[in-house]
């Protein structure tokens, strides 16, 4: 670890040249082991200790480089178990170690840039970025003023080679990139490690950290187009995406105003009325005050950018342009829309009175009940119509564990959907979980639900299904809320982004 810290203290001009030798250092794989691999599954053979196993992983890289013609002897498919035994180690396990080591090494240049940024050595590229925890609150405050929104499914690269080519603009060590390219191409099942699942990548549990690093870097590069949003009023656009300059000098040319001085014939300034960009996983929202014509221009601008810069074919149907007043927006597990709230005002001037109609925009967020019932149906809490069922798999647990599990599920859902404007859908989920819990307890005692509740009382389940709105009301007792106001009150909790599974029903 001390050697790793000494490396980080090197001058930035030297660090790119020393990434490749780090792949042969044992402490790199120790870091990868501590961060990514599970200690309980690390050793398949009791005769190996951690140090010798890490050394074998390091030797595997050396053999793969010096004997590339014989790489099949070291990377054996899963079906050939006899040859695995002859080699004396689990090939898939050590290939996982190598990819985890790659992830540690490739993250070093970006970590150093982060340190430089924190020390004030680098200028911020974008001043309008917000934290992920503020995404929900920003959508509620900013989207209410928007008129149209583009629902974007972020495209994925056709080939992992595209990710390596993009990565070379940031990692200047050619040897490391060549070795990375070799592993991606020569690894027997590399193309099965990453699979397409709708709009996002679905990673296998093996090598998850490494491929998440590549994918996050890909998304970061995709979002580089929004460097134009640094200036809130005027931005640059091009007639053809072929005029995009190389990424390596992209920011420098913008800062030197080369666009406005040397490319007046193909680039011009245009007024951008209002733009908000929010991304979560494989989806993004681009909202604007502008007209549908402006949003369509942005749509085809993005499509051309993806195809020419990332060499990806992205179908136009991956970007849906909707009017927020007429369509619901599916994002972060919420159904959101902007509706007009009519308001009638009476104004009187001396003898005459006037009725003035006014309408204000209101941002609505609703809990999607159909996907929620489908999720509960898949988890065997109810049938496809939403009728509660018992959970036989939990019948062997104690009563307190059963009630705690059901209560924890509901509290998580209540916590996540506390930003919903109407709670009727949440109350229906509460009914399903409470009755499913009661039926599970009754099944355990081989009794009916009515007899069980009559004997123990309904209050047995009440404390485990306490809603967070009630806790909020008890905490701030000096603030008076009626039951109707509490029902319509929207509370955003900043940690809901951590509950990933609740926001991805796809």
From Swiss-Prot:
Predominant subcellular localization, coarse grouping: plastid
GO cellular component labels: chloroplast
InterPro entries: Domain_X, Maturase_MatK, Maturase_MatK_N
Any one GO molecular-function label of the UniProt entry: RNA binding
Subcellular location: Plastid, Chloroplast
Annotated keywords: Chloroplast, mRNA processing, Plastid, RNA-binding, tRNA processing
GO BP annotations, alphabetical order: mRNA processing; RNA splicing; tRNA processing
HAMAP family: MatK (MF_01390)
Function field: Usually encoded in the trnK tRNA gene intron. Probably assists in splicing its own and other chloroplast group II introns.
Protein family (similarity comment): Belongs to the intron maturase 2 family. MatK subfamily.
This protein's name: Maturase K
Organism: Phyllodoce caerulea (Blue mountain heath)
């Amino acid at each position: 670890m001390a050697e790793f810290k000494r490396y980080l203290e090197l001058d930035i001009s030297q660090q790119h040249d020393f990434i490749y030798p780090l792949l042969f250092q044992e402490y790199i794989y120790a870091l990868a082991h501590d961060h990514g691999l599970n200690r309980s599954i690390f050793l398949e053979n009791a005769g190996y200790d951690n140090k010798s196993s890490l050394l074998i992983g390091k030797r595997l890289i050396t053999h793969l480089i010096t004997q590339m013609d014989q790489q099949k002897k070291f990377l054996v498919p899963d079906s050939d178990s006899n040859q695995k035994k002859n080699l004396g180690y689990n090939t898939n396990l050590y290939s996982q170690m190598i990819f985890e080591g790659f992830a540690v090494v490739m993250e070093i240049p970006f970590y150093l840039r982060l340190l430089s940024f924190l020390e004030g050595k680098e200028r911020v590229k974008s001043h309008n970025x917000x934290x992920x925890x503020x995404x929900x609150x920003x959508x509620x405050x900013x989207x209410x003023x928007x008129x149209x929104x583009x629902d974007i499914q972020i495209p994925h690269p056709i080939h992992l080679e595209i990710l390596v080519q993009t990565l070379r603009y940031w990692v200047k060590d050619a040897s490391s990139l060549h070795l990375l390219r070799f592993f991606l191409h020569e690894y027997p099942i590399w193309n099965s490690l990453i699979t397409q699942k709708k709009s996002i990548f679905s990673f296998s549990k093996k090598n998850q950290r490494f491929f998440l690093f590549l994918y996050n870097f890909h998304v970061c590069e995709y979002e580089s187009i929004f460097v134009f949003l640094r200036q809130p009023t005027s931005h640059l656009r091009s007639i053809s995406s072929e005029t995009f300059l190389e990424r390596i000098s992209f920011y420098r040319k913008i800062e030197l105003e080369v666009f406005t001085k040397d490319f007046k014939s193909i680039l011009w300034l245009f007024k951008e009325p209002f733009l908000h960009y929010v991304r979560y996983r494989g989806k993004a929202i681009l909202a604007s005050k502008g007209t549908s014509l402006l949003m369509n221009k942005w749509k085809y601008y993005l499509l051309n950018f993806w195809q020419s810069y990332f060499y990806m074919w992205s179908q136009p149907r991956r970007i849906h342009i909707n009017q927020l007043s007429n369509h619901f927006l599916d994002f972060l597990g919420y159904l959101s829309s902007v509706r007009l709230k009519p308001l009638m005002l009476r104004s009187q001037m001396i003898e005459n009175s006037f009725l003035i109609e006014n309408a204000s925009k209101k941002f609505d967020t609703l809990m999607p009940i159909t996907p929620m019932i489908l999720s509960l149906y898949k988890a065997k809490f109810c049938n496809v119509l939403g009728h509660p069922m018992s959970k036989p798999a939990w019948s062997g647990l104690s009563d307190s564990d059963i009630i705690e599990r059901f209560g924890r599920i509901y509290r998580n859902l209540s916590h996540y959907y506390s930003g919903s404007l109407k709670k009727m859908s949440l109350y229906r989920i509460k009914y399903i979980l409470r009755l499913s819990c009661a039926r599970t307890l009754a099944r355990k005692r081989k009794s009916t639900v009515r007899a069980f509740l009559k004997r123990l009382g309904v209050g047995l389940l009440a404390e485990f299904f306490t809603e967070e709105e009630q806790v909020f009301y008890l905490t701030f007792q000096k603030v008076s809320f009626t039951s109707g106001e509490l029902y319509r009150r929207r509370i955003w909790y900043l940690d809901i982004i951590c509950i990933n599974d609740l926001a991805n029903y796809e």
